[in-house]
Amino acid sequence: MAQRPSVPIAIIGNYISRRRQVSLEEAEALAQGLKCRFLGEVHAIRDGPYSYADGTLESILNLYRDAFFGDFDSETGEHRKEKEFKGEVLSSGLKDIAKQKRHKLANIFMNPKPPKYRSSTSLGGIATGCSPRSVVGVGGGNRCAHRPVCCTDNKFSECLPL
C-alpha cells in the first residue's frame, strides 16, 4: 500500500466535461505555489486506472489529506445541465467520503452570469464570489493553512481565504 504523503495533493482539472479550465502548466504552478503535490487532470482519475465508481477514488482520498477540484470556464458552464448542480452521485459521493474520512474537499461549479463560482448543493456555498478563472480548494502550505481559498487571476501568486 502506498504511503500517505506529508503534504496535501492538488488534483486540478475538469471532472465532468473533459474541458480543461487551466493548462497543465498553470495547474502545476498552482500546486507548487500551494506546496501541494500535483497529480494531474481529474479526468485521468475518472477515465484512467482509477475510478470513483469502483471505489478506487476513495482509496486515493484515503492516502491524501486534501483534494483540489478546479472546474469549468464560463463557456463550458453555460452548457451544463441543471441536474448536474443537484446532489448527484458524484458530489454526494465526495461529500460522504469527506464526512467518513474527514477529508477536506471542495468540488465547485461556476455560475457564468455574473462570473462567479457556485458550489454543488451537497457541499455548500464555499466558492461564492470567485472569478471565472480561479481555482477553489482547501489549501496546503503556510499561506492557505488548510482553509478554503480562491486563487485568482490565473496567476496563482496568492491564496485568499474565503
From Swiss-Prot:
Q: What induces it?
A: Expression is light-dependent and positiveley regulated by the GATA transcription factor nsdD2 that binds promoter regulatory sequences containing a GATC motif.
Cysteines engaged in disulfide bonds, as pairs? C36-C150, C151-C159
Which CDD domains would you find in this protein's record? hydrophobin_I
From the Swiss-Prot or TrEMBL record, state where the protein is found. Answer: Secreted; Secreted, Cell wall
What GO terms fall under cellular component here? extracellular region; fungal-type cell wall
| GO MF annotation: an example | structural constituent of cell wall
Keyword terms of this UniProt record = Cell wall, Disulfide bond, Secreted, Signal
User: What does the record give as the function of this protein?
Assistant: Aerial growth, conidiation, and dispersal of filamentous fungi in the environment rely upon a capability of their secreting small amphipathic proteins called hydrophobins (HPBs) with low sequence identity. Class I can self-assemble into an outermost layer of rodlet bundles on aerial cell surfaces, conferring cellular hydrophobicity that supports fungal growth, development and dispersal; whereas Class II form highly ordered films at water-air interfaces through intermolecular interactions but contribute nothing to the rodlet structure.
Listed under subunit, the entry gives: Self-assembles to form functional amyloid fibrils called rodlets. Self-assembly into fibrillar rodlets occurs spontaneously at hydrophobic:hydrophilic interfaces and the rodlets further associate laterally to form amphipathic monolayers.
Name the family: Belongs to the fungal hydrophobin family.
What is the protein's name according to its record?
A: Class I hydrophobin 3
> What is the species listed in this Swiss-Prot or TrEMBL entry?
Coprinopsis cinerea (strain Okayama-7 / 130 / ATCC MYA-4618 / FGSC 9003) (Inky cap fungus)
Name of the encoding gene: hyd3
